[in-house]
Amino acid sequence: YEICACLVGSEMCIRDRNLTPQRRLALVRELKKLTGRMEWLVEALLKMAQLDAGTVVFHPQDTTAAELVRRAAEPLEVPMEVRSIRFTAQAGEERITCDVPWSTEALGNILKNCMEHAASWVQVTARETAIFTEITVQDDGPGFAPEELPRLFQRFYRGKNAGENNFGIGLSLSRQVLAQQNGTVQAENVLTGGARFILRWYKGTI
């Protein structure tokens, strides 16, 4: 659908000579938004195909929760500011051994999901045990309907609160990335309201 919409919009801009300058400018702006969404969708689908085919070679290295959160949150700083979402991170020197770029992708998808559903804030915390290092992402949004939780990480599943930019891919991709790095991700509702995602990188085989 996204690709078709982009192509149709492009054709309108090129062929319709009766468009006013204002209408043409509005179409160009909308096309830029559609193109950005299309690029993200194509990249995500390619990554999932690579993971499915087993062609991804992970390169584990030592990092910290603070560094991983910083990398994942950086691209979302402006969108959060535009949405007036307050972002706080309580992550420090908790050690994580992982493929940093892929784990940044996984965490970034979770952060993006929380940002899109938050009412006013997104919070990240981290802790380390002898068995795993855990990063928790929480928001103050509507949370999940009970029937959504079992399907949340299924590919192409879109919940009832899914926005127009939600393709049902990001959470599934995050789970794939974590699973192939000896990790897990789960989601739950917070009793006081909002959603919580728990990502774990284990230090041994699970």
Where are these regions (language model features)?
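Short conserved segment of the HATPase_c
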Residues: 144-157
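Short alpha-helical segment of the dimerization/phosphotransfer core of two-component systems
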Residues: 33-38
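Acidic ATP/Mg2+-coordinating residue in the GHKL
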Residues: 139
